[in-house]
């Protein structure tokens, strides 16, 4: 127990940690610069299991006092004054807390520990509790607005707004719950926009039931079949390409035409009772016709080139 007691005009501090003495007996002048004995206060420790100091006027007891200044070793501070700091709110506003004794408190404990130490603060119908900022608590709902003796100011570790029986959190989340900012700018991936604004025009396709398409398909099939037959008729037609095969086919056809012309000549066919011509004669006639036909074809090519 430590005791500091000086003159009444100077500060007095009385500390009784873990004392079970009656805290209602005024003994000294305290925390007052004047000589008035009515403003004296006594500093005593909380007689519960917590280390701390309690300030209250020397003319009142703990049971009927409305002013409490509680310094606890667990970082719980309560300041009560008989006067309200702000003019009382009588219009039925949402926060009539300035209407009574103002209590300032800092709480480092859990809410259950605060309730065991100061049930008046926790059980109030309207309270504004904070854990990282200042808040106001009041029980003006249970008492008339003219009673200025029960207003509280609470400072604790997280911000909780309590109006009636609802508790709403008004403070941002703790820094430990936030993800660290790495400084990287995350950008949404954008799809490359095409010149047609992403719209692809369908190709104009003809329906398979179109008569023109069906006819063209059938024509191509017939041409391929005839070419295969011609390759088989021309000697060595399957061993060369299509152009060479066609040229040979043309020459072969002309040769056949000459043979037909020679064989159809009357001179080669004697009259009835006559003698049939020799094969050598027929061959000479065919060669003459072929040579003449080649000269005619060459002349036509030269004239076409000259033109």
Swiss-Prot record:
Pfam families: HLH
Compartmental location: Nucleus
A GO BP entry: root hair initiation
Keywords of this entry: DNA-binding, Nucleus, Transcription, Transcription regulation
Induction of the gene: Induced by jasmonate (JA) treatment.
Region entry Disordered, spans: 1-49, 167-215
Major localisation: nucleus
Function comment: Transcription factor that is specifically required for the development of root hairs. Acts with RHD6 to positively regulate root hair development. Acts downstream of genes that regulate epidermal pattern formation, such as GL2. Acts with RHD6 as transcription factor that integrates a jasmonate (JA) signaling pathway that stimulates root hair growth.
Protein's UniProt name: Putative transcription factor bHLH086
Gene name of the record: RSL1
